[in-house]
Amino acid sequence: MSLEDSLRSLSLDYLNLLINGQAFSDVVFSVEGRLVHAHRCILAARSLFFRKFFCGPDPPSGLDPSGNRVNSSTRSGVIPVNSVGYEVFLLMLQFLYSGQVSIVPQKHEPRPNCGDRGCWHTHCTSAVDLALDTLSAARYFGVEQLALLTQKQLASMVEKASIEDVMKVLLASRKQDMHQLWTTCSHLVAKSGLPPEVLAKHLPIDIIAKIEELRMKSSLSRRSLIPHHHHNPHHHHDHLTAAADLEDQKIRRMRRALDSSDVELVKLMVMGEGLNLDEALALPYAVESCSREVVKALLELGAADVNFPAGPTGKTPLHIAAEMVSPDMVAVLLDHHADPNVRTVDGVTPLDILRTLTSDFLFKGAVPGLTHIEPNKLRLCLELVQSAALVMSREEGNNNNNANNNNTGSSATNMYPHNHMNEEHHSHHNNNSNMDSRLVYLNLGANTQMSTSRLDSGDDDHNSNQREAMNPSMYHHHHSHDY
């Protein structure tokens, strides 16, 4: 067992203590009328706040914002927690026990600040509020690692969030001195084009002044890139503004076309108007918001890079599909040569995302935000990405051997050969020491029917045979259920 597997196993063992509730528990919290059993030694070891609370001569009163001290008799019984909500408190405990957390509300779950019943809650107001509440709790209880993780989550959210939510995060980032998040949000607000009188309804005057200063600097910077004509000093500024507005209009038209499955219009925009699909983030948008058929048609245009890193985090479309736990999207991206080993700015691969979701899902009783995941889809996504990664790894090894033997004339092999993939799949499942295989087949499949779906009834037989070769056992009932 590798060091990574050992650490993952240790993390899951500790998290299991939290899930089992009363097992070896020596402290009970009451949060919003619900009891949460925990363990003093773990909380004290992981949080300075809890260490002082349990062991200090003068414990903090932070669990009760009314300021009432918790006496010894109360600390030996049920401890009321009024400073945070149940969901946020449980997310924080999960991180304290395991070092991992997923700050995402349940998919399609009715949320207080989200009226869309089909929302994935990836960047809506409800998702932003949950992340902000988690960040506040992490800072309050002194869990700095969780605070940093939540800041990264918020930085990813605000790229697609509404401008109102961006301003909400902007205020929180200033209040808690989060400079990187402040920079991201302030630039987004500056680029929004909202006039100061509108910003004044949401932001204090000093922040509006900083936003206007950013706009001025940005305008001067862009103007300096173009030669000046002294007879008309305002000409270039107006030209740049018009060009930016034109690009925004193109992107909005492109998204409307994708929403209506009109890929032909997108093609005309690429050929006739010079639309850059990568800069417009067409593929990430289609993966997250459109159907598999639209994504496939967009890829077949040949104008979008399937491995293009988007946003400040550098996520590729395959990263997004992995986060969505969508085997349809994962399959079509891999069919068009998406790289399963590509990393984000933080060094995370699509396989890492699926591994984390797998370990989190196994303990969904302690993770309110992950109960929506369908085990069959998660298992299939993990299997597809693992198989593709194994094939690429072997191909790279073969290419290196050929290069060492000066056999440069050999032709490149297909990325997903039928027999080759089948061999990799069976070799992978015969390795009993592999942590991912144990998680997928012993746990994810333990409480669910082995009923999976066909990925693309309209695709050609070649692609279907490729995926069947990855895992023949998964498709023995493939006509009985559709995703």
UniProtKB/Swiss-Prot annotation:
It holds the Pfam family DUF3420. Gene3D superfamilies: Ankyrin repeat-containing domain (1.25.40.20), Potassium Channel Kv1.1, Chain A (3.30.710.10). Disruption phenotype: Altered morphology of stipules. Altered morphology of flowers. Production of abnormal nodules that develop roots from the apical part of the nodule. Altered abscission of senescing leaflets and of petals in developing fruits, even after complete pod senescence. PROSITE patterns: ANK_REP_REGION, ANK_REPEAT, BTB, ZF_C2HC_NPR. Residues 398-414 have a biased composition (Low complexity). Residues 456-465 have a biased composition (Basic and acidic residues). It comes from the Eukaryota. This is BTB/POZ domain and ankyrin repeat-containing protein COCH. The gene is COCH.
